[in-house]
């Protein structure tokens, strides 16, 4: 839009020393964005309400540095290690013009926003694999990562004489960490059959904070809130942690040259705790089976049927107060500490037909899903004058298609 040009590039170096293979890389990717938008709203009787014109400029360049190591310990064992560090600061400036279409003459209010943003993350991971003489395989892996995000949104009313008055201070910060370790052992059973069993343990933590300041005659302005009056926000400062353990067993069976069957049984045990403005601990457990059958009816026609229980992982950001920068009508979004995992039974039938001379493939999918504890937006308004919504469990439902 403004013909802005920014440089970017990447460089990598790879090599081998004995049994060690390595790759180092660095990437600088410009993500500058200049966006101009117009939004017109109407009332319930279809009368024009207002028009909002907004110019948003984001100055951002992503810097990524990675390392990959692969070492062959012997003909039967190997180890790998990966590391990543990334910086994605995204300072943003906003200029907004709001025209009241109900007023005569029409009046336009001007707002300016400064939103410095700091974002960075890192991740390390690795795995070890051992193959026995008989073809059995043992594998263990680990992953550890951390994501840091912080932003301070300050909004100003701009008057006709060029003077300004701050009317919003919103400081947001979050740190998400995750640690996963998984081990498995795969062995043959009978001809055409093998079994894999193991377990996974994961720890996920979110530290979240939100500070809101508004101009108000009721209260004392604070420098920590941009010179505005601190406002009470429900669930603004919280730490959410989940400890999850998943033992599993997977059986693969090649019945014949045309049919295969995969069966999985997973047991999920988790504890979710929240501390800070809200203190609560809950335990959950699920048994998740899965069956997947494949049949090559002809070389051109493949059929597949599956049935499984799926448990969706919760988004920790739904537990705590947050902000939608694209919604100017709602400064903060409520969190919901009572969320439960959404889960569903998933039944699918697939058919793939390969057209003659390999000119294409025709696919068909029939499905039936039984959802439990579906998550969607619910009303959590404390009063008719303070309308609020949050993600919550709305009940059960079926999906057919």
Regions found by a protein language model. Give the residues of each.
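Transmembrane beta-barrel wall of Gram-negative outer-membrane proteins
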Residues: 3-36, 48-94, 116-132
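Extracellular loop and loop/strand-boundary signature of outer-membrane beta-barrel proteins
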Residues: 48-55, 107-114, 123, 164-171, ...
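Outer membrane beta-barrel strand-and-loop segments of large Gram-negative receptors
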Residues: 178-182, 336, 340, 346, ...
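Face-selective signature of the C-terminal outer-membrane beta-barrel domain
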Residues: 66, 70-88, 112-276, 296, ...
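Outer-membrane beta-barrel translocator domains and adjoining extracellular loop/strand segments
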Residues: 35-44, 92-101, 105-107, 150-159, ...
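Membrane-embedded beta-strand positions of outer-membrane beta-barrel proteins
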Residues: 24-26, 81-83, 140-142, 197-199, ...
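Transmembrane beta-strands of outer-membrane beta-barrel pores
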Residues: 2-3, 17, 28-32, 85-89, ...
């Amino acid at each position: 839009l403004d013909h802005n040009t920014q440089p970017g590039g990447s460089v990598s170096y790879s090599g081998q020393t004995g049994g060690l293979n390595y790759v180092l890389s660095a990437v600088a990717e410009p993500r500058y964005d200049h966006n101009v938008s117009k939004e017109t709203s109407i009332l319930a009787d279809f009368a024009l309400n207002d028009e909002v014109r907004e110019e948003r400029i984001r100055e951002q360049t992503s810097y990524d540095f990675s390392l990959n190591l692969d070492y062959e310990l012997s003909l039967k064992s190997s180890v790998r290690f990966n590391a990543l560090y990334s910086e994605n600061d995204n300072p943003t400036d906003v200029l907004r013009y709001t025209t009241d279409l109900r007023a005569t003459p029409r009046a336009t209010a001007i707002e300016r926003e400064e939103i410095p943003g700091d974002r960075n993350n890192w991740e390390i991971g690795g795995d070890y694999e051992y193959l026995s003489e008989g073809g059995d395989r043992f594998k263990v892996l680990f992953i550890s990562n951390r994501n840091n995000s912080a932003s301070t949104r300050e909004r100003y009313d701009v008057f006709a004489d060029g003077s300004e008055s701050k009317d919003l201070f919103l400081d947001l910060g979050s740190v998400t960490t995750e640690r996963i370790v998984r081990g498995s052992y795969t062995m043959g059973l009978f001809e055409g059959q093998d079994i894999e069993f193991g377990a996974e343990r994961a720890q996920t933590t979110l530290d979240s904070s939100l500070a809101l300041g508004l101009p108000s005659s009721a209260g004392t302005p604070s420098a920590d809130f941009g010179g505005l009056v601190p406002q009470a926000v429900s669930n603004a400062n919280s730490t959410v942690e989940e400890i999850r353990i998943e033992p599993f067993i997977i059986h693969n069976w090649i019945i014949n040259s045309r049919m295969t069957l995969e069966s999985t049984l997973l047991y999920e045990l988790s504890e979710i705790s929240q501390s800070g403005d809200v203190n609560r601990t809950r335990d959950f457990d699920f048994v998740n089976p899965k069956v997947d059958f494949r049949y090559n009816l002809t070389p051109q026609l493949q059929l597949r049927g599956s049935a499984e229980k799926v448990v969706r992982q919760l988004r920790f950001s739904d537990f705590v107060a947050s902000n939608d920068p694209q919604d100017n009508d709602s400064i903060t979004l409520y969190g919901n500490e009572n969320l439960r995992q959404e889960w569903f039974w998933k039944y699918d039938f697939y058919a793939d037909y390969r057209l003659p001379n390999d000119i294409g493939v025709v696919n068909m999918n029939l499905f039936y899903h039984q959802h439990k504890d579906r998550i969607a937006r619910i009303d959590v308004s404390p009063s008719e004058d303070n309308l609020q919504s949050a993600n919550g469990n709305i009940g059960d439902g079926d999906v057919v298609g």
